[in-house]
């Protein structure tokens, strides 16, 4: 890969394909879908513009402190003229508060607490009156392994999660209990075939498998096949296949269901620098009972 100048901006153009949700558009109709602008000094995104059929819908701007920490994020929804401003507060480079203010008056504050190892022990979401709406409580095994996580939410949707590890500190079991349905699901991770892509089985409280993930890797340790089976409302199978280029970038993927019907596919192209230049995406849309296909083209400008 050749040396690359810092990226100044990325523009994404969406080319509508005839059929699906775009059937009312001509075959070659295209519009600017997304623009990203980068801060050269911090190598981070400073502005994002989202558009729909050529009309700007949302502008997002970001600002950072001297350490590169995000300190503000502003969303401007042009159609509704609504603004959403979020301010981030840090102590010793740890995020301790995130305050989100909406132009219609609502305020939401998220506060973070940490232990002596700088790991989060609690995350709480408060409304404008300081009343807790949601929270996450973390307990650890040793210095850095999450042993227990409790997620509290309104309307009885609390969730409790326990984790178990092997001698290599890999998660081998995750038990999740939901107050919403009073059921327990246990996820088992099997690292026999690969350290980074374990096979997975999820069992209900009766010990029956309700979901399973089986993965295949090539000699380069790249994921080439991922099979998912679920038994919710009948047995369903989804098999996703992957292909890569010499840079290790995914150039093709497709997901086929148990009936052999395409659920989604992506064909990706890259330049000699490894930058994504185009994607052809196809997705099965249940609402229309048809495949919706479109192309995304990526263009870059660079700081000199």
Q: Residue locations for each model-derived region?
A:
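Buried hydrophobic residues that stabilize the cores of well-folded domains
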Residues: 1-304
């Amino acid at each position: 890969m050749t040396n690359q100048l810092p990226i100044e901006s990325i523009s994404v153009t969406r080319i509508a394909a005839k059929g699906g949700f775009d059937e009312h558009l001509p075959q070659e109709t295209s519009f600017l879908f997304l623009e990203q602008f980068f801060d050269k000094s911090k190598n981070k995104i400073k502005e994002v513009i989202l558009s729909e059929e050529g009309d700007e819908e949302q502008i997002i701007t970001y600002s950072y402190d001297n350490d590169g920490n995000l300190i503000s994020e502003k969303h401007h929804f042009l159609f509704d003229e609504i603004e959403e401003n979020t301010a981030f507060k840090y102590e010793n480079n740890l995020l301790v508060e995130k305050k989100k203010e909406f132009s219609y008056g609502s305020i939401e504050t998220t506060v973070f607490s940490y232990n002596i190892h700088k790991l989060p022990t609690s995350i709480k979401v408060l409304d404008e009156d300081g009343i807790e709406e949601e929270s996450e409580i973390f307990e650890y095994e040793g210095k850095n392994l999450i042993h227990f996580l409790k997620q509290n939410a309104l309307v009885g949707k609390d969730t409790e999660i326990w984790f178990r590890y092997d001698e290599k500190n890999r998660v081998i079991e995750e038990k999740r209990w939901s107050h919403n349905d009073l059921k327990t699901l246990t996820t088992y991770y099997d690292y026999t075939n690969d350290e980074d892509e374990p096979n997975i089985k999820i069992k209900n409280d009766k010990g029956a498998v309700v979901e399973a993930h089986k993965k295949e890797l090539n000699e380069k340790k790249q994921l080439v096949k991922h099979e998912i089976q679920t038994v919710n409302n009948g047995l369903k199978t989804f098999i996703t296949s992957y292909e890569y280029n010499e840079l290790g970038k995914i150039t093709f993927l497709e997901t086929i269901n148990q009936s052999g019907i395409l659920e989604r596919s992506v064909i990706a192209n890259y330049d000699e620098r490894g930058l994504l230049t185009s994607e052809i995406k196809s997705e099965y849309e249940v609402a229309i009972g048809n495949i919706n296909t479109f192309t995304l083209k990526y263009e870059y400008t660079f700081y000199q």
